[in-house]
Amino acid sequence: MSIATTPIETPKSPKSTEPQVRKRKKVSTVCTNCRKRKIRCDRQHPCNNCIKSKKHNACVYDDGQVSPANFSTNGSSHGNTVPESRPYEESARIPIRFDAEAPRKKSKPNTPNNERKNSKKSPDNTVANNQQTASENEVTITLSELNMLKQRLQNIEANINAQSNPQSNPSYVPQTPAYPTQPNILPPPVSFNSWSPKQSNERVMFSPQQRLTTNYNVSHTRGQSPSIQLPPLSFKDTPRASIDSAPLYSEMSPPRSDLIASSLTSPESIQMSVSGDVVGVNPYLNETETINFYDGYTSICVRDFRRVNHGPFAWSSLMRKDKALSSLWNHILKKKEKKNVASQTFVFGQDVHEISQENTQLVASESNESETKFKKKTLETFGFNDVVPYDILKKKLQTQINKTTSPLGLTLYEEQVNMELQLVDRIHQQLPKKKVLWKLIDRFFSLLYPFMPFLDEIDFRESVTKIIGETEYKDEKIKELKVEKRLDLAVIGVLLIILRMSYLSLFCNKESVNEMRLKTTDPSPEAQDMKYLLQNPIGISLIDSAQNCLQYFDIFRKTSMPVLQCAYFLQLYHIFAPEDGDDGDGADTYALNSMVVRMAYSMGLNREPDNFKDVLNDKRQNHLGRKIWHFLVIGDVHNSYAFGTPKLIGDDFYDTKVPFIEEGNENLIDKSLDQYVTKSVFPGYFSIYNSVDQILKLILSVSRRSKVSEICKILNQFEIGIAEQYGTLSDCLKPKENLIHIFARNMPVKMYISLKSFLVSVYFHLFLYYEHKNDSLSFFYLRKILKTGAGDIMPHYFELLGNSEVVCDMVINPKLIQIIHKANQINIALIIRVNMSIYRMKNSQHHAENCKKDDFYYSYYKELCKFSSCLTRCAEVGIAAVSKLSTRYYYAWKITKGHNFLLKTITSMEFYEKESTNAQEITLPKYKLEQIADLENICEVALNKLGKTSVMGDEFCSNVNYKKYKGDQTYSTSSESSSTPNKDSPLDSRKYTNDFGLDLVNNQEIDKIWLQMLSLKSEEAQQQRQQESQPFTSSQSQSQSPLTSANQGYMPRPESRRGSYYGNTPFALENLNFDGFGGQSKSSNNGEADLSSFDFFVDLPFDQLFTN
């Protein structure tokens, strides 16, 4: 094995004039610490001075011999218990350095004078400890010394191998690992940049970054030249009983720290900042390893006539790739199959089912029963209505034509012009009063326009005025719509969408605030306008009409700016709509986004208008085109890093300039706001665009494997860029006095969450890649996942929900739901691994005896139990947070119900009893005790900020109670956090948590609302398919439903909704036959209209899902 070493600098007094380079070949017998401090050393292993100064782990001699304290079981050779210290403290004090000048002076002899000159040229950036100054010089290393070091390394390697040889350790008992592990030797070195002494010597030391410490570039190349690595540095050893007590070990005994050596280049020793974060550091195994993010799972889902592809960051891809999550899903399927053998899911379905006659009849039926409507909707959204035989539909349509006639004399077979006029008539009935309409338009251009600046306000208001009449704030209905040409339908479509989105922006996540606004007696114009708009809701039916407007244009052959704007706004609505949403996989809007991009290409928005001044000479239209194009570019990149979908826009295929400020090109009446948007949106985003684009090119490559080293190097720059531009989420959430508009306060938060969600996905893929290859690297990326998801973002869940002064709820909520979905998915995967490790230890033959006799074994088991408690509480916090949105967001409701059921499943003993045969693949890697404690501490600190101290479901915790083995029968499901730092969290950290509460919003009233919405959507879809043969009447448009009533968009607590809210025929949840539903549909869906979407929700056993 080739062991690489990196030279370390030996500090020297700044006033000394002695030569820097060692002149003697004789090995010093004094340890490096004593030599630095210039004190007498007793030459022990470790020496007394190092023990007193708590540096026993760094007691190293020049011959490469490391203190046995790093391998002993007692802490020191003197029997003293050494206080604990973090593993990277010493490495942080001794940064890795290379001298860039020494190899270039080959022609000059290594005289003391020349050596002194060389050493003076080296900059001194040494990180000093509390006993040293910051002006210590570094040691230059020449080629001759490198050869000498290589010779020494061979001796070091032989010593380490001898110490780690099980046969040489009389107290070692052979263990059978639960999965393949690394040999108990030095782990493979971590690489950043290749380095060879024969090549040109470039400075590999990076300068310190802002708010970051030095970025270490540890060099290592395999197959090129002998590599260089620092002497090993072990983790601190937890005081425990000596191994000489010969405890009885089972196959699940924890890894012993005294049998595992660690390296300075291992991830545990990398320390980049004072707070313990490792920013800009992403280690890898070697320069030759490659990865493909599509390996290990099937990204294409096929069921019957339907086929869907998902990117590597979609929830379904992570679910299928992770062995723990896939085993959970298989377990759920087995439970369903016991009750219904035909039950299958679309995500993990294996058999191709034929289209049954039962399903065909169900889709074509017109039953008003709630259960039938629900089943019918799920079949329709999976595309069953596309395969219903025409002969069945012909009979239905003929019956309807004979039964009903239109007052205008229109039938299904009349010309398209008549159908367009019929649509206009229906829209006329749906439009709100004049005052509501113009107030909502004003709200859009003052509040929402910066988030979607795709209209010219002057042109739009002029077009709307021609259609509905002059601007009048009167509380009266619009008399008529003057539609002169088909293109006016595109303008009407845009109008309907912005009315709906402006209405949705009125609502706050705090129900108390919404109630106060609805019942306010404040006479101020702002408060009264808010109350008036809330009392005049904008229904979902307007979006259906807007989509119908778009369908009358031949967008596959030709298009225009109003049509493009209508399609683009429709795509954005599907992202922000509470009843819709991207659903965590991006499939809902990907097809529509692709169409919008192709429309923009066909219109030439990818070309710079200044290059065609003969035809493109309207400043405002040119400015609008630039904004639309670059927002499409931003959205394309966002879809790629959020869901893993391929990019649609190539950098080589457009030359459109970034929008710029020019006199006369403003698209708003408020010119200052338009200029503010122009100068703030694009520079802030494109500053990190290059790094994201480079990462995506490597990660999303399907045809080739990418080098892990290249991905990690770009990730380093990307992380540093995020830290420099955004800081932390706490920094983004601090209101800035100079940023008046909510857009400026909101966009940094949204961008930060989006980019961190992307990084968590990448870290999880790297964790899975290294899980069975290298424990050190898998731990490193697991730690980064928890540091980002639990340590950085989770404490702010409720602040993101309630801090409307900084964030716009409608804009932030979809992204917040997505990252909670992803974080909880990873939490569940980790809980399965930790609990399976606990389960195997607990069920081993000598578990009780080991707990009583071996303190280390007991400590390891105890830390696993506490870590399980922390992860479970993190998952419960996520479910509780997203449940607060379940009253208004359908996607949030599905996450609440689904994840709550999954969490109950994995915290029961039944799951582990039945899945124990697959335990080797879903067990936590054998991390050290200190590593598990570190992960637990990250979670505990975050939970402490939220005040989450107890586990709601404690079945598993009660069964694996570790305290009974020490005679302490008092047990609590909360983690023991007496030693947790930051115990007294700031009051404002829990302010928003207290406003919402950590309880789970789980109410049958809410379930009925969303289930009824699915039934209503089914009915609306049926009516749309028959609208050509059915006349539109005002009585039909005025029918009430839970989502078209006065409370639409705002759903107060269930107690205030009982009674008339559900109409005359309440939706009976208890009447739904979920078992039959699962068997009939084979592949049911979430109730959304897009056929490219599916989710885990309806694949769960419904009879258990809705049981509290």
Curated annotation (Swiss-Prot):
Disruption phenotype: Decreases MDR1 expression and leads to greater fluconazole and cerulenin susceptibility. GO terms for molecular function: DNA binding; DNA-binding transcription factor activity, RNA polymerase II-specific; zinc ion binding. It comes from the Eukaryota. InterPro entries: OAF3, Transcription_factor_dom_fun, Zn2-C6_fun-type_DNA-bd_sf, Zn2Cys6_DnaBD. Residues 1-27, 68-138, 968-990, 1021-1064 are annotated as: Disordered. SUPFAM superfamilies: Zn2/Cys6 DNA-binding domain. Transmembrane segments: none annotated. CDD domains: fungal_TF_MHR, GAL4. Residues 86-104, 114-123 have a biased composition (Basic and acidic residues). Induction: Expression is coordinately up-regulated with MDR1 in drug-resistant, clinical isolates. Expression is induced by HAP43. Keywords: Coiled coil, DNA-binding, Metal-binding, Nucleus, Transcription, Transcription regulation, Zinc. Residues 134-165 form a coiled coil. Residues 1-19, 68-83, 124-138 have a biased composition (Polar residues). It is found in: Nucleus. GO terms for biological process: DNA-templated transcription; positive regulation of transcription by RNA polymerase II. GO terms for cellular component: nucleus. It holds the Pfam family Zn_clus. Residues 970-980, 1023-1041 have a biased composition (Low complexity). Residues 31-59 bind DNA. Transcription factor that acts as the central regulator of the MDR1 efflux pump. Other target genes include those encoding oxidoreductases, whose up-regulation in fluconazole-resistant isolates may help to prevent cell damage resulting from the generation of toxic molecules in the presence of fluconazole and thereby contribute to drug resistance. This is Multidrug resistance regulator 1.
